[in-house]
């Protein structure tokens, strides 16, 4: 099954992959060669640390390549959903009790980062928002209890 991903999320993954292949991988290969030159590999902490780093980098490269190969990249600027919330929407919500506004973009599971306001399409918040329109109210089951929000705006930004 192909995982939905925004074009911006795919670009971030490609940039990380490129950095790992063009910067990190060559650096760790150099570090291994330098550590190997120090002699006995059994008690060579630098060598073992560099090999461990190499293993991590190669694992991350494989993971990123797999994620990108299974991603269905969706250009959200071409979605004609209007004010209806679907994948890729940037939604501004107002807490009905406090009037505090929060802004989230609904993205694929692999690119979600709550600190950046990117919520996974499989998250309870995103599932509650999908299909709603500007002006609709939505009730979210939060750890602190139920919260009610009003959908202030829906946009499809890249």
Curated annotation (Swiss-Prot):
User: Family assignment?
Assistant: Belongs to the GreA/GreB family.
- Gene Ontology biological-process annotations: DNA-templated transcription elongation; regulation of DNA-templated transcription elongation
* Function per UniProt: Necessary for efficient RNA polymerase transcription elongation past template-encoded arresting sites. The arresting sites in DNA have the property of trapping a certain fraction of elongating RNA polymerases that pass through, resulting in locked ternary complexes. Cleavage of the nascent transcript by cleavage factors such as GreA or GreB allows the resumption of elongation from the new 3'terminus. GreA releases sequences of 2 to 3 nucleotides.
Q: Which UniProt key words apply to this protein?
A: Coiled coil, DNA-binding, Transcription, Transcription regulation
| Phylogenetic placement of the source organism | Bacteria, Pseudomonadati, Pseudomonadota, Gammaproteobacteria, Lysobacterales
Q: Name one GO molecular function term.
A: DNA binding
Query: One Pfam family name from the record?
Result: GreA_GreB_N
UniProt cross-references to InterPro entries, sorted A to Z:
GreA/GreB_C_sf, TF_GreA/GreB_CS, Tscrpt_elong_fac_GreA, Tscrpt_elong_fac_GreA/B, Tscrpt_elong_fac_GreA/B_C, Tscrpt_elong_fac_GreA/B_fam, Tscrpt_elong_fac_GreA/B_N, Tscrpt_elong_fac_GreA/B_N_sf
- Coiled-coil intervals in this record? 45-72
Q: What is this protein called?
A: Transcription elongation factor GreA
Q: Which NCBIfam families match?
A: greA, PRK00226.1-2, PRK00226.1-4, PRK00226.1-5
């Amino acid at each position: 099954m192909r995982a939905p991903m925004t074009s911006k999320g795919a670009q971030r993954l490609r940039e990380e992959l490129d950095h790992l292949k063009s910067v990190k991988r060559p650096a760790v290969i150099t570090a291994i060669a330098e550590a190997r030159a120090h002699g006995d590999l059994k008690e060579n902490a630098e060598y073992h640390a560099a090999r461990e780093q190499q293993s991590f980098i190669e694992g991350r490269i494989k993971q990123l390549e797999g994620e990108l190969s299974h991603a269905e990249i969706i250009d959200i600027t071409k979605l004609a959903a209007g004010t209806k919330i679907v994948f890729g929407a940037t939604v501004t919500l107002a807490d009905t009790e406090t009037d505090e506004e929060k802004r989230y973009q609904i993205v694929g599971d692999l690119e979600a980062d709550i600190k950046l306001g990117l919520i996974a399409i499989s998250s309870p918040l995103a599932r509650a928002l999908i299909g709603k329109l500007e002006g609709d109210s939505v009730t979210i089951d939060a750890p602190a209890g139920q919260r009610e929000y009003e959908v202030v705006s829906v946009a499809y930004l890249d």
